[in-house]
């Protein structure tokens, strides 16, 4: 990674621009757009459309297009369009605007990406895992030992000028920020750029990279108050909590106590105070949770602190119910597409003392995840796989495809759902979802062939069922042979990019 960063640094001449604090001249370098669009450095991202528009394929065509578009963005009256600028109206303008936004986002990411290389910024490298992969060991190993959890919804949207002021502290390049302001004002829905829901902003589809950069920078600033949590590492390790129950509980008490120095003038016993408990923080998309072993009063203080920080620093008002404080033993919270909580599981321990033995009844806390069936059915309703009552219907849009293509599409969705929710404690709730998809597939085939579901199932036979079974189910059943597979949680590290039907908010 560092070698690649050095090569890119030398190629982009970043050293010279960093000393002058200017990123704006990089907009007129064609290789920026080639790198932003994953093209080769020798190919031109502008050549193909310029051939259709009558441009000469020279080296100045891309720079000319960028200059003209930037000029149009800086103009105050967007209704004045000359005849020579007719190429930038309609779908052509949308293409060039998207192209420049991709390159512009890549340029704006340079100051942030430099921080990832410790040798460039001369900072210490943090060894803790600040990614989604660190969420799973936190849920499995640490959450069951905590008492309270705050379910936090990151406030949005942020005003454009406040966002630019925040970026000004990170990017000291006035021309680039001014161009960003003009570019955002060019779109009427710029106020919804910071909304994490993809369906609320067409800008996220046309300029996804710039949208992600703006949203990540906004979330980064919202989380800046929690920067001290970097010092607390959360490595990928799994330690069973069933062994040494009493000893673990004893040392857990000792860790949270400190002895105050005794004053010689007062003949009193040593005073014991509780340490300030550690606050754990994890986030996925626009939702985050804070959990701790502290009291409800301290959690309310944290809530008050976060709300005031967002209001004073970003002028953001937390949404009604944006922060919920619940006790883990009595309430569940919705996170990562699961309804999660901590439940007490009865446990019997056999104790042996010399020749006598006796049984001890105790209870241990266990992290529990449940697949919320109603939100998933709501997602299937939006995708038109079933009605509001959960009754499967045919997917008429796919009726023109081949039989194998229809079966493969439904099977792909079913496998992704099973793959994503493999971390559930009770997988039998997914049987209804699989039934809806399987019957919707049969109804789609029956609609195509103008037949009935019974005839389709009899004709296809096992072929219709085999597509909905995954190879990984056979592998997992072989690994966990002799155990109850439905009660085993298996977290796959690629679930962040496979399931679009899971409602995360």
UniProtKB/Swiss-Prot annotation:
UniProt GO cellular component terms: chloroplast
Ion transport is among the record's keywords: no
Coarse class of the protein's main subcellular location: plastid
One annotated GO molecular function: RNA binding
GO biological process terms held by the UniProt record: mRNA processing; RNA splicing; tRNA processing
Keyword ATP-binding appears in the UniProt entry: no
Pfam families, A to Z: Intron_maturas2, MatK_N
Record keywords: Chloroplast, mRNA processing, Plastid, RNA-binding, tRNA processing
Localization annotation: Plastid, Chloroplast
Taxonomic superkingdom: Eukaryota
Protein purpose: Usually encoded in the trnK tRNA gene intron. Probably assists in splicing its own and other chloroplast group II introns.
The family this protein is said to belong to: Belongs to the intron maturase 2 family. MatK subfamily.
Protein name (database record): Maturase K
């Amino acid at each position: 990674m560092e070698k690649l960063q050095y090569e890119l640094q030398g190629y982009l001449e970043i050293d010279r621009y960093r000393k002058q604090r200017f990123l704006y001249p990089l907009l007129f370098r064609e290789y920026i757009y080639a790198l932003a669009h994953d093209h080769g450095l020798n190919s031109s991202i502008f050549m193909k459309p310029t051939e259709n528009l009558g441009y000469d394929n020279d080296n100045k065509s891309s720079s000319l297009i960028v200059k003209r578009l930037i000029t149009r963005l800086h103009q105050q009256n967007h209704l004045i369009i000359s005849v020579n600028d007719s190429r930038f109206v309609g779908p052509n303008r949308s293409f060039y605007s998207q192209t420049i936004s991709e390159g512009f986002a890549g340029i704006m990411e340079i100051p942030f990406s430099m921080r990832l290389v410790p040798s460039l910024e001369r900072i210490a490298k943090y060894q803790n895992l600040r990614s989604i992969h660190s969420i799973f060991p936190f849920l499995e190993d640490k959450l069951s030992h905590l008492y309270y959890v705050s379910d936090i919804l990151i406030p949005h949207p942020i005003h454009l000028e406040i966002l630019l002021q925040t970026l000004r502290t990170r990017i000291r390049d006035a021309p680039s920020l001014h161009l960003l302001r003009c570019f955002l004002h060019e779109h009427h829905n710029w106020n919804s750029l910071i909304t994490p829901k993809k369906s609320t902003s067409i800008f996220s589809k046309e300029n996804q990279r710039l949208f992600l950069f703006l949203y990540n920078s906004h979330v980064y600033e919202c989380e800046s108050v929690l920067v001290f949590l970097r010092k607390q590492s959360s490595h990928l390790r799994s330690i069973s909590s069933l062994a040494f129950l009493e000893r673990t509980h004893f040392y857990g008490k000792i860790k949270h106590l400190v002895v105050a120095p005794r004053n010689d003038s007062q003949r009193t016993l040593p005073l014991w105070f509780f340490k300030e408990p550690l606050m754990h923080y994890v986030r996925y998309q626009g939702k985050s949770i804070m959990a701790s072993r502290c009291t409800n009063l301290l959690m309310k203080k944290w809530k008050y602190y976060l709300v005031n920080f967002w209001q004073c620093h970003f002028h953001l008002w937390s949404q009604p119910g944006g922060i919920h404080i619940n006790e883990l033993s009595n309430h569940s919270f919705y996170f990562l597409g699961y309804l999660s909580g901590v439940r007490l599981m009865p446990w019997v321990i056999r104790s042996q003392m010399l020749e006598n033995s006796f049984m001890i009844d105790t209870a241990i806390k266990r992290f529990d995840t449940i697949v919320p069936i109603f939100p998933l059915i709501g997602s299937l309703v939006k995708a038109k796989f079933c009605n509001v009552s959960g009754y499967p219907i045919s997917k008429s849009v796919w009726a023109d495809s081949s039989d194998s293509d229809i079966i493969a599409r439904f099977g792909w969705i079913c496998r992704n759902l099973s793959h994503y929710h493999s971390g559930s404690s009770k997988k039998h709730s997914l049987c209804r979802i699989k039934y809806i998809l399987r019957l919707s597939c049969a109804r789609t085939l029956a609609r195509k062939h103008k037949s009935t579901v019974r005839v389709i199932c009899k004709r296809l036979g096992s072929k219709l069922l085999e597509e909905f079974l995954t190879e990984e189910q056979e592998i997992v059943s072989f690994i966990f042979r002799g155990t109850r597979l439905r009660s085993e949680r298996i977290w796959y590290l690629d679930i962040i990019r496979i399931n679009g039907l899971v409602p995360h908010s």
